[in-house]
Amino acid sequence: SSIGQGSDRGGGSEKVLLEWLPGLLPETHGKGKGKEKPDNYDRYRSWISNTPIDLRSRHPQIKEQDFLQIDVATNAGQWDVISLSLVLNFVPQARDRGKMLRLARTFLRNRGLLFIVLPLPCVQNSRYLDFQRLTQILAAVGFSIVKERHKQGGKLIYVLCRAEQLSVSGEQTHLGEEAFPPELTAKRSLRTGDRNNFAILL
């Protein structure tokens, strides 16, 4: 989002994504979609074709689009990279955050990449989410974590995930047609004390 691009929020996350991509994604498979500034990837047009979207676009080159309303039939298995940079934390409902992750897996090709950026307190100081639970949620919808970065006392956590090959039952899972473990579908307290209430539910 444009707010998250500010230096007071941690700066442009595309720098981390571009640092990680070489060696993980063939140059011919550089298409990405995410919520970014329109010129974030201009220097990399030789191998990246990106389509920036935002719920309320403030720039003519950013498509105004609700990620949760993207047509599944025409986009399933069509994307190589999806960047959800400071996006999940702006989705109001915990279950819609889970739906966004399921849709991301639906839209990605097998072995595609999902880049997630969250405010660090969403993972380190949440009553309902820690890194282990985030890993479980991602695995349940078909992702494995390949890279993670954060600084102790920092503002953000960066997570890069690989879309794993799905079985027939797994293909139903990321579409929400198969039951998930109960600890991933309802809020379960993981920490006590003064915490925030950020959660992701499937």
Model-derived segments and spans:
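Class I SAM-dependent methyltransferase Rossmann-like catalytic core
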Residues: 1-26, 198
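Adenosine-cofactor binding site in Rossmann-like domains, unifying the SAM/SAH pocket
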Residues: 35-79, 83, 92-95
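Conserved SAM-binding loop of SAM-dependent methyltransferases across substrates and taxa
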Residues: 14-26, 34-47
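Eukaryotic short linear interaction motifs
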Residues: 35-39, 58-61, 90-91, 122-126, ...
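Class I S-adenosyl-L-methionine
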Residues: 124-202
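A short glycine-rich, Lys/Arg-flanked "PGG" loop and its adjoining helix->strand segment in the class I
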Residues: 95-113
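Catalytic phosphate/metal-binding cores of nucleic-acid and nucleotide-processing enzymes, i.e., regions
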Residues: 86
